[in-house]
Structure formats: C-alpha cells, structure tokens
C-alpha cells in the first residue's frame, strides 16, 4: 500500500528561554541565562516547515504547551492565586519557575514513538507518548502531549494513542529521538531500531552524563505499539558518546528508508548492528562518518546528525541541516564530499534554527515522523497540515502574542501567563483542537 512520511513539527512556545535545565545537553548548559527571542524562534521553525512543504514534503504542526504550568507549582506546595504563586516561586525558588516555563515540548521528536500501520500487528498507526522521566521539566509534558495527539489523530479506527509508561527511572523513555525505522517503500513493512542507553542488568553505561533511555522502556513501547516482533532490533548506544553530549540517538544517527547515516562511534556494538540491518533490510546502506573526518565533539557542536533525511520523488534523498554545519569548515567539507559520492543523499538544505539550537535542539528534534497511507492521512485533523493559509495565520498569531526578548526574570510576569493562555486559546480554535489545555478545562483563563 502506498504511504508517505509526514513530518509533524513542534511550534516553539511563548516562554522559550535559556535556563540550562538539561544536564547532558551541552548546548543547553552553555547558553544558560542568555536572552532569548521567542518570536524569532517560532518564526525560524515556521520557515523550515513552509520551505519543506513548498518543496513537496508533507508537513504539519503540533502546538506548544501551557507555560508557565501553574498546576505543577501547586503540586510543589505553592498556594494562592496564579499571580501570587508566580510571585512566590520567583522569590523563593526561581529554578522551579524556569522548569515549569520550559518550552521543551517544541522538540516533538520526544513527544512519542510511532509505529506505522504496515509494522503493527493490528494494522493501525500507533503512537506511545514518552514519559521523559529523566528531567523534571520534560516529565511534565506527557498528559498534554497525549491530549494533543488525540486531538490530531482522532479516528480510533485508524490510530491508537497510548499513554506514557509509568514515571519511574527503570522505564525512562525519550520517544522517537531514540528510534529509527528502516526499509524500502514507506508503505511496506520495515525494521524498527530501538536505541537505549542502559538496561537494569547491564553495567555498560555512561559515567559522566545520564543514559535517559532504558532497554526496558524500549521493549515496553514496542509491545504497546504492537510492532511485529520479527521486525524489531534493540541496540545500545555507545556510552562513550553519551558522555560527550549525545543525550539522544538522534544527535549521532538518522535513518530514512534503506539508509542509516551515523557516526562510526554511534552504537556500542556497531559492526554487529550493521550486519543485522544488512541481513534484515533489502538494499541497506550504512553511511558511517569516520572520526578522522568529523569528531564526535564536532558532530555534537554542529548537530550534523540531528538532521532530517527526506526522500524525494526521484528516489534521491535531501539532508536538512542547521546552519551550524555550514559554519563549521570541517563538517561542511565533509558534507560537500558526501553529496558528490555514490549514495542516495544527493542534496543538502540549510536552515537557521539558532534559537532552538542554543537550547540543544536541531531540525530532527523539532519533528515527529509519522508514516501514513492516503486513508490515514485523510483521517488526521486537517487543520494542522501546513499550507499557505496556515503559514500566514501562524505568523500573524506569533506577531500578536510572542515577545522578541525574554529573560528568566520575565517568567514571573503575570502578563506573560495571560498572554500565553490567550494565545493558546486562539491557537486551539485555529487548529480545531478543542479544549486540550488544563486552563481551558478549569476556566482558569478567566482568572
């Protein structure tokens, strides 16, 4: 059956700021306390979406979350009106205010893990929400992510959206950022590669930075998504690269159809994995970048592998990269050599995503890949699909509500909270989502 990959990109939230909340993510730590520009951030993301849609790629949007997230502060013992809580937490525990104001839901590669219908035992598209257990600010996301996905993938005859795994370290799950699918045509059965950083009985794990994904979680997600057991491979990421800032597998590898583009040091038992894939995937091709051409540290600094690898109509592939790759002489030299060689990657396209990149999120972080047949695509909420009208509407919406300068101190401004809620109220109507946010369900928008 014919199917296509649809990229669902996350819209950057109104409270996008640099707080250094993500230990193990070196860009996040390095840019802590810098002044951010939320309006520029959301527009950089929109420009990427629109450019790819104009080039013929199927593109959709996933909205941001409600931030600052007052219910989490109430759980932490802060009391009073919303405004009083903001004032208290800003004075008593500003770190918590930054955490509940994080715009991290924009990195929807961590929203869920997706199984196309061709790989599922029941013939449905499955999406299992990630619990993002390793970081407090990200562990807040799962309930609203689930509500948003249910509002987008509404048809229960076509889609099954599963709640996140229990919030315990043993089942730490980071979603599609640690998942790749390889195969031939999108509509044919593929091989799903689940990548983990640790497992309970295995002492091989990083020493400096946390391994966020557990094998136990990956196995549970594969079961929930009803992935055919004959089509699954579980592989451990190289703990040494995690300790160099590769906090998700999509910082060191990306796949599309029969191609795996990765660093030579990406996986713990890389030769074994490559041989498995060669046996299981017809026409499999591994493009392994040697350290002598691109070091792991340069890959992390430029996000070479946090790229999008997209199939074009002629069978060739386009590699979508952040501008940091072009700015790095060695990486750019390698890329120009790559597209001149005999492999499916025949073109590269560069985007300026500096606002997201400074928090450690490149092109791949910003998108969730969902393979859909024509019938399944018709069942998706049509209001989220990118086109000229939606691009114009979202830019006007961003101009109206987003600030062009934000610091950590601004997060305590009650006006920012009100601006955000009003913006999301408008957005849910624009995208036909219904009342997906807690403030809409409690009437807090009136208060």
Swiss-Prot record:
EC number in record: 3.5.3.23
Pathway: Amino-acid degradation; L-arginine degradation via AST pathway; L-glutamate and succinate from L-arginine: step 2/5
UniProt keyword list: Arginine metabolism, Hydrolase
Enzymatic reactions: N(2)-succinyl-L-arginine + 2 H2O + 2 H(+) = N(2)-succinyl-L-ornithine + 2 NH4(+) + CO2
Gene Ontology terms describing biological process: arginine catabolic process to glutamate; arginine catabolic process to succinate
InterPro entries the UniProt entry points to: AstB_sf, SuccinylArg_d-Hdrlase_AstB
GO molecular function: N-succinylarginine dihydrolase activity
Enzyme active site: 174, 248, 365 (nucleophile)
Domain of life: Bacteria
A Pfam entry, by short name: AstB
Residue positions binding substrate: 19-28, 110, 137-138, 212, 250, 359
Complex formation: Homodimer.
Similarity comment: family membership: Belongs to the succinylarginine dihydrolase family.
Function: Catalyzes the hydrolysis of N(2)-succinylarginine into N(2)-succinylornithine, ammonia and CO(2).
PANTHER family assigned: N-SUCCINYLARGININE DIHYDROLASE
Protein name according to UniProt: N-succinylarginine dihydrolase
Organism: Salmonella enteritidis PT4 (strain P125109)
């Amino acid at each position: 059956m014919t199917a296509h990959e649809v990229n669902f990109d996350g819209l950057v939230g109104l409270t996008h700021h640099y707080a250094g909340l993500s230990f193990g993510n070196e860009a996040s730590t390095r840019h802590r306390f810098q002044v951010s520009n939320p309006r520029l951030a959301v527009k950089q993301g929109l420009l990427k979406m629109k450019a790819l849609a104009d080039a013929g790629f199927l593109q959709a949007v996933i909205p941001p979350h409600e931030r600052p997230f007052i219910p989490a502060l109430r759980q932490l013992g802060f009391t009073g009106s919303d405004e009083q809580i903001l004032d208290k937490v800003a004075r008593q525990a500003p770190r918590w205010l930054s955490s509940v104001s994080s715009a991290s839901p924009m990195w929807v590669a961590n929203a869920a893990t997706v199984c196309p219908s061709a790989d599922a035992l029941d013939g449905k598209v499955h999406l299992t929400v990630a619990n993002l257990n390793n970081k407090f600010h990200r562990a807040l996301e799962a309930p609203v992510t689930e509500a948003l996905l249910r509002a987008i993938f509404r048809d229960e005859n076509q889609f099954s959206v599963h709640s996140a795994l229990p919030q315990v370290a043993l089942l730490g799950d980071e979603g599609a950022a640690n998942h790749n699918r390889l195969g031939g045509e999108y509509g044919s059965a593929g091989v799903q590669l689940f990548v983990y950083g640790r497992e309970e009985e295995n002492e091989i794990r990083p020493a400096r930075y946390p391994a966020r994904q557990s094998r136990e979680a990956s196995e549970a997600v594969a079961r929930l998504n009803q992935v055919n057991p004959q089509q699954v491979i579980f592989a451990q990421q190289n703990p040494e690269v995690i300790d160099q800032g590769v906090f998700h597998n999509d910082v060191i590898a990306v796949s599309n159809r029969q191609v795996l583009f990765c660093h030579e040091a990406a996986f713990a038992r890389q030769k074994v994995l490559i041989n498995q894939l060669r046996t299981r995937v017809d026409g499999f091709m591994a493009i392994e970048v040697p350290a002598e051409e691109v070091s792991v540290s340069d890959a992390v600094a430029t996000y070479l592998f946090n790229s999008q690898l997209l199939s074009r109509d002629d069978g060739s592939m386009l590699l979508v990269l952040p501008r940091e790759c072009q700015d790095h002489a060695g990486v750019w030299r390698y890329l120009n050599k790559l597209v001149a060689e005999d492999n499916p990657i025949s073109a590269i396209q560069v985007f300026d995503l500096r606002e997201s990149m400074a928090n450690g999120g490149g092109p791949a972080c910003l998108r969730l890949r969902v393979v859909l047949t024509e019938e399944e695509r018709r069942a998706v909420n049509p209001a989220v699909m990118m086109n000229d009208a939606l691009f114009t509407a979202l830019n006007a919406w961003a101009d109206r509500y987003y600030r062009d300068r934000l610091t950590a101190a601004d997060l305590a401004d009650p006006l920012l909270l009100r601006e955000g809620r009003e913006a999301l109220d408008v957005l849910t109507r624009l995208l036909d989502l219904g009342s997906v946010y807690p403030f809409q369900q409690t009437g807090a928008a009136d208060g």
